[in-house]
Amino acid sequence: MSSSSSDENETTIHSSSNPGSSGIYSQLKAGSSKRPSVRHDVSDAEDDEEPYEGFRKDMNMEVDERITTLLSSLHFEHKRDVVTADEDDNKLRELHENIFSLITTEPDFHRRRRLKKALPASNCIREQVYYLRRKPITPPDSYYHRLNAALHTIVKESFGEEYRKVATVLGLVEALAEVLILEVHAFGIPETNAVEHRNIRKLIANALTNLTYGQILSKRRLCSYDGFIRCVVRIIIESPNITQVYAGLIRNLSWNADSGMSEALQPTVHALSLAAVYAHTHRFDVTAILSALWNLAGHSVENKRTICETPNCLKVLANILSPDARFTTLVDSASGILKYVSQYLATNSSHLELRSLLITRMLTLLKSSSFTCVTNTLGAIAHLIAKDPHMQQLIRQDAAAVQQLNVLRNSNREDIRKAVKEVLNTLNQPCSHRYGDMSHSVGGASGMLSEPQLQMQTSHHGYHGTASPRLLSLRATRASPGKYIHPSQQQHMQVPAPDQRSSSLPRHFAVQRNGFMMAQSFNQQMDPHQQQQQQQQQMIFQMQQQQMMIQTDDQQMRYLNQQQQQQQQQHYQQQIQRNQNVEPVLPVDDDLDIPTSTVMGTRSNSERSLGSMNPGSVMTTGGWNSTLDTAANSSRALSPVSFSDIPASPTMCAQVFNLPVHPEDNQMTTPPNHPSTQNTTHYSSGSANTMTRSDGTTVPIDNLITPTYATLNVTNNAARKTSEDLESPDDILPGPSLEVEEEGDYAIITGAEQKSDDDLLTRSIQEEMPTSSSTPKLKVSPRLNGFFSPSQKTTSSPAWSHPDTSPILKQTQRPKHHEMTTDSDRLLMESIMSEMPRSRVISPRLASGGQQYLDPEPDRSSHSKNEEADRRDAIIASHEPSDQGMNVGRGSSPQQQQLHRMESLESQASSEDSFGLNGYQEEHNTSSSAAHTMRIDKDDVVDASLPMDCVDDEDYDYTDDHFDDNYEEDYEDSNATQFDEGIDPQLTIDCSMISSGSGSSLQKAETTAGSRDSGALATSTPIGSVSSLPGVRRAKKVSINGKTRLPVPKTNGSLVDRVRKPVIEASRPRLPPKPSLLKGKQYHEEDLIENQTRDDTIYVNAPIVEAEQERIYMNALKHSQGSPSVNGTPPKSAIVSPYNYQKPPFTERSNGEINEKNVTPNPKQMLVTIV
């Protein structure tokens, strides 16, 4: 808008500086500027020679004037109803030829080129004007195409400033206005072909909006054009789909409008207000409409009245106000409208029901990020609260708004500081309370205050002024009901009850005398007769005050004597002996009801206090009925009386009643033979004792429950100590007795509770034990379950849950007296051992013997996550039942059984402390690893079944009916041999022969063929997942070359041998597959072993540790050489390696036993040989 104003000023200055120019289309020379150094994108070539500048200017003005003269002969406004003929069309073509000939005489090449470019579109618009004069019922298709093309060209080019000047010279503004008027007059708001007409009218509005931007003469000409504003109003009301573009046009026309333009645009205010109400849910429409209304609202009071009187318009504006930054443009327009509208609302009493809503919503805009929004909001608030005390009070009650106003006082913008100053001055004006007057309720007394009383009540000490915006304004300036009335009228008046409105006033806003609550300010002019009556009333009041003072002095002396007598007594009267039915003896307050300057200055002219002790005071008719002596005790039963009453801890603040007390304790104790009665308040629950040192009870106000301490009594056998002898406050406080079972603050420990505490302690110790892999608390992996305690057939459970092996007692286990020491020692030992950084395994030998301990294992320098997982699988495995259900094998020695069992475990990556052949080495080399391995007895039955990685326990059915009999059709091997008895359960899993990419061709072929025929890689699936297989097939074929291949399932499953096993629980956890790459090794002793064994190749997804493979192979070789098998079958062995292990390359050993072979590893498979 700023650019438009500058352009308007330039155009206006140029028009006034050339009085001899004709027409309203006199414009600046295209490309010229007041600043010669500034050049536009499309500018004329200016000659530096000064003699030619004046000549060119005169020539340009001569061309523009001649073109304007030719166009003025058309008289569109006067000949609008004249039906054109063919002769008129010929004259129009001759006119266009003359205009073209004038353009050719333009000396400026760039200007001449722009005029020629804009001429065809302007000629087309004029031709359509002549066509529409014929009032066609159904226009031809050429009408839409030609007019639509011309309008698109004009809208596209009208964004340039130079084109807008040239188009104005060629008369495009009048032509477009006439086309719009004739278009609406000829076709109206059609229902048929509405899209074409709507597009044409939308393009006309866009073209006029661009052409009038920054052109004040064009705006003035368009506003004064006959019938144009009426046509726009009709379109806004009847065509809501194109209201947005015409609202933008009105916005441009109303910006910086003069009086004539404002008067011409006044009919559009009502139409735009209605459109804002109808389209309030359409954001872009409302934004354009409110922008136009913002400009129009500042034109005249009539426009403001029209906006206010439009139904629901102010409600829509109030609902639009929001501090959300996304609607800043919309809120700026709405707040701008309200800034102007509030000026009209401040001068009349209309729309009172909407003012509070407007104020409330505008207060939320004080923190807006838009300076325009904040300025408009402050201006609207200042106008609305200028003469409205209710709105002022509404703002004072909003502490956040007052704080934000104080913040805006220091703004850097002058307009904001000025607006805030106006608002704060209105809020802080001393006379703002005058607008809150209330009429008299009773008595008919219009004013009876004397001048001294009027000065007293209006002084700074008499009332809290409203100068501070933080304080509430006074609710009334006249008494209701009247106070200073004639005594004859006073006797007929009813005394107001505490629940009346007068008693609801705050203390510092009311004055109470003679039983009536009265407001503190009184501003009313009194005639002499009223002043005389009030002086008489004042004299009567002074006499009453003197009598009250005499009575007050007598009551004060009696009260002081009573206090001295109580202090001289050795034993005080107990306050609890007063029953609720007995009226308390009320003391007298000596410093109240005395109208002195001190009281008026310190108590805000209010002679009523919360602690008034005068029985005949005005408190009997007021809202406060407290009789507590505030001068003597202002704590209101919230503080203890003596040092002994101060509790040592919150647990002492409990109810301790009916305990014997010492007769000489203090005034808080009850006599020994006197029944203890509680002094409870009427509104409390009745359980808390509220006795204090004061002589009167406290009547609660507004059902307020006062928190108090319980009465603390001392037992008879407790030694009484003074405050100087007290070592701690606990010495005189009652405590529970451990010998006598009674209710108190502490529990009494007996047999049953002690047992429960033992169980609780046990469980706490068990829960707090570390959860590392060395803790026996963890569960054993089901795959390792049964390797250590195959004799137990119970379900799988942690070692701590077994009653025979658990070192921690359960609730069902009751320890005997002679076993407590042993159990404690064992618990201590287990706790110490559990914190050791080693993995522990409980020996089954010691577990069966009744003693348990954890054997240490070799130290390690580092542990990986996979080592921790493998260690957890091996913890307390000896105490788990065996779910394999198989023995080691036939004809194998205990050492071989032990070897096979230890090799079946998941060993550690370092292979130094694995569960490999350490058990076997214990027999042959007792000095090397006897203390570092698990303790296994020779008579233990070792499970030598396949590792659980080869078995899918989820849904496997071990019945013969479950096996797939169609396996022979899927896979037929001509070189295979049928075994009716299945695979020999005596299995030896030997990893010495590795099938890899660079191995033997036979092994490679078998490896690839087995993997390809299976249809899927042999990847394991954890138990419980959706991809678990219902079962696997039984092995049918065995290859002739001596390598028996167990069939691989078609989908992700595990392998299992034919031997039937019991159904394994589905909830057994499985370790995720983490394959590692393997390397095959060639040993010199392979031929000897292959002659004695026939192995079978199985592909599983578990990785293998090559170092462990070599070590096991060497141990097995030594054992076979030392004690050859009778049947020619080597000992069983099973290796399951830990995850994430890759053996570093090694060189050829010196003894020539192992040679390095470069093989291509296959990370997907691990070769396991079975004999």
From Swiss-Prot:
Gene3D superfamilies: Leucine-rich Repeat Variant. It is found in: Cell junction, Adherens junction; Cytoplasm; Nucleus. ARM repeats lie at residues 312-356. Residues 857-874 have a biased composition (Basic and acidic residues). Transmembrane segments: none annotated. Residues 1-481 are annotated as: Required for interaction with bar-1 and hmp-2. It comes from the Eukaryota. Residues 595-617, 666-697, 788-799, 890-913, 1002-1028 have a biased composition (Polar residues). GO terms for biological process: asymmetric cell division; cell fate specification; cell migration; embryonic morphogenesis; endoderm development; negative regulation of canonical Wnt signaling pathway; negative regulation of microtubule depolymerization; negative regulation of Wnt signaling pathway. One of its GO terms (molecular function) is microtubule binding. Residues 15-26 have a biased composition (Low complexity). Residues 591-1171 are annotated as: Required for interaction with pry-1. Keywords: Cell cycle, Cell division, Cell junction, Cytoplasm, Developmental protein, Nucleus, Protein transport, Transport, Wnt signaling pathway. PANTHER family: ADENOMATOUS POLYPOSIS COLI PROTEIN FAMILY, APC-LIKE, ISOFORM A-RELATED. Has a role in endoderm cell specification and pharyngeal development. Required for the migration of epithelial cells, organization of the anterior seam cells and ceh-13 expression during embryo morphogenesis. Prevents hyperactivation of the Wnt signaling pathway during endoderm development, probably by preventing hmp-2 nuclear translocation. During larval development, apr-1 is required for expression of lin-39 in P3-8.p. Shown to negatively regulate Wnt signaling in vulval precursor cells. Interacts (via N-terminus) with bar-1 and hmp-2; the interaction with hmp-2 is relatively weak. Interacts (via C-terminus) with pry-1 (via N-terminus). Probably associates with bar-1, gsk-3, pry-1 in a complex. Belongs to the adenomatous polyposis coli (APC) family. This is APC-related protein 1. It comes from Caenorhabditis briggsae.
